[in-house]
């Protein structure tokens, strides 16, 4: 997680506590999903993220440490059909992840200080982008998947003024994504195979 979300929420009385509240909400949401490890980056301010060299380096370091074959991230592209997909922080993180995956994470000459720290180059095989203007990959969700997603999102109490509305939006989105494929529910992505 790049920021602690300290500029999010709508309750101004909680402004001083917002960063820690949002971190706690993220921890609980990840527990609901069975996430084994949650990493928070430090030094990036909510609402002010840009795909800087420092952010790319931090993502490269994480990629080299974890060595994933697949990364899920947000699209760096504008999606004019959905205002929610266009948060500038989300697009900036998507751009930084893209630059980190190729070429930096696999290039031994990129960020030599990481190599000196024992973080060897790594090739991420696929990146799945969510929220972009186009999709080319669908993952079927069963009812348990949808319920887990709803429970996780409901942990973000300070993020959403109307959690029931958000739950309905999640359920409807899963249904809409699944319908053309004969699924009760689905999640759509743009899938980028980085192997060529």
What feature does the model see in each segment?
Residues 1-67:
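Active-site rim/loop-helix segments in enzyme catalytic domains that contact anionic ligands
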Residues 51-196:
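Metal-dependent de-N-acetylase/amidase catalytic core
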């Amino acid at each position: 997680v790049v920021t602690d979300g300290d500029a999010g929420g709508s309750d101004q009385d909680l402004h001083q506590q917002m960063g820690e509240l949002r971190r706690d909400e993220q921890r609980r949401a990840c527990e609901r999903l069975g996430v084994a490890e949650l990493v928070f980056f430090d030094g990036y301010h909510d609402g002010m993220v840009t795909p800087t060299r420092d952010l790319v380096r931090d993502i490269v370091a994480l990629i080299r440490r974890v060595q994933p074959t697949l990364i899920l991230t947000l699209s760096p592209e504008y999606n004019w059909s959905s205002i929610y997909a266009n948060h500038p922080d989300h697009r900036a993180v998507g751009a930084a992840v893209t630059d980190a995956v190729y070429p930096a994470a696999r290039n031994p000459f990129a960020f030599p200080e990481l190599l000196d720290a024992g973080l060897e180059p790594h090739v991420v095989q696929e990146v799945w982008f969510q929220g972009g203007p186009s999709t080319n990959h669908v993952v079927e969700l069963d009812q348990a998947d949808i319920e887990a997603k709803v429970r996780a999102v409901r942990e973000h109490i300070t993020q959403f003024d109307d959690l029931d509305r958000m739950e309905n939006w999640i359920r409807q989105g899963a249904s809409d994504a699944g319908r053309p494929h004969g699924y009760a529910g689905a999640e759509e992505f743009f899938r980028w195979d980085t192997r060529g």
